[in-house]
Amino acid sequence: MTLKIKFVILLWLFILQNASCQDGDNSVNSSPNIILIFTDDQGYNDVGVFGADDIDTPNLDQMAKDGAKLTSFYSAQAVCSASRAGILTGSYPNRIGIHNAFMPNSKVGLNPSETTLAEMLKDKGYATAIFGKWHLGDAQEFMPTKQGFDEYFGIPYSNDMWPLHPQQGPIFDFGPLPLYENEQVIDTLTDQTNLTTKITERSVDFINRNKDNPFFLYVPHPQPHVPLFVSDKFKGKSKRGLYGDVIMELDWSVGEIINAVEENGLTDDTIIIFTSDNGPWLAYGNHSGSALPFREGKGTAWEGGQREPFLIKYPKEIKGGVTIDAPVMAIDILPSVAEVTNAKLSDAVIDGKSAWSLFTGKSKESPQEAYFFYYRVNELFGVRYGKWKLYFPHRYRTMNGQEPGKDGLPGNYRMVDLKKIELYDLELDASETTNIASKNPDVVVKIQKLANDMRRRLGDSLMNMEGKENRAPGRTE
């Protein structure tokens, strides 16, 4: 073999080895795009693959075929602001001082010292955008552009916080609903008919503009929170009235976003997540969703209040058509994204743990031993532990036995006092009909120990306990 041939062979071996090393580095240091689609007040039973037979959701159904469907995914809390704080920070909302739903001109908001998903990814060079509903404080220092987002188009709080609220006057005194572009009010909304379309168009445009760079796109749709609005192209299309029409348009929006990803050749490099902030607002009757087969809805710790439809698609690592039954909570999304993107977590304590090995099939176990269900101002209502769900005595609201609302007008809740500990086996009794606490004393004791440990850390107003680890929200005062 001549020296020339030997040189050529060695050169090719060097090139191949170097290419292999580079490929390995790229797989380790991958920066997949992240798209988080987050609807408002959508029930578990409002998607075809989760049981809806009167609403067509072809794009979400296809997303389940192409990715994983989680049957035990929980929002961080059963109400707007708190839920959003949890999914964006990886913390229980009460850890960071976020409770309930902020009203307009609130002097409280998400503390800028907390690290959001957007800030975590921005530090890795991601372009970041939010199109939709913010609801984590409408003072300038709390707005999305101060919390890691490069771009913002949408409304600062819920779409019903406007002068056309059905209880305007007797209960509320809302001003005009502002529409923001970054930090500027560009319009006040008197009609929301085309808002879903505009949010979708902005999302598609953002994907097109950032096809050559890693990006994080957060799409917190204001719908199907009341008041319901749908564009003409979907009006009257469903078998479930206006509410079903709205869900069909949201499904269309998901399809448009997925199409934009595909048309830009980004399918294998993009993680797409779909879920909702809490269960349906049952007081609104035919303008609310369905959480069946689960009990109750928004504003409660029962399964219907926080168990949400959840889909995740990432062909590179997540097999299609997979169903995952292990419990996961919204607080686990941020650390999961951190793992897959190799992003650095904040030094501050958070509650979430990565569920990435569960999503990819490398594990069958929940990332956490237990999940804790707080509501109102730091009241611990319940705990999910494996297949078990335990509730502590507390007051909750129900529409059972009440006249439901109709056509945009709410019905009146009835308040119920849960007077003793109740325990349910969710594998056998997902509808939480039969209290079996007395038959499982060892389980009750175990969960009480877990709850007491959490109370020491984050407190429990029902027990007059203050936590040692709570952080303050942001304040303008």
Annotate the PLM regions.
Residues 2-4, 19-422, 428-449, 453-456, ...:
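Formylglycine-dependent sulfatase
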Residues 3-11:
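Sec-dependent signal peptide recognition
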Residues 12-20:
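Hydrophobic h-region of N-terminal signal peptides that target proteins for export
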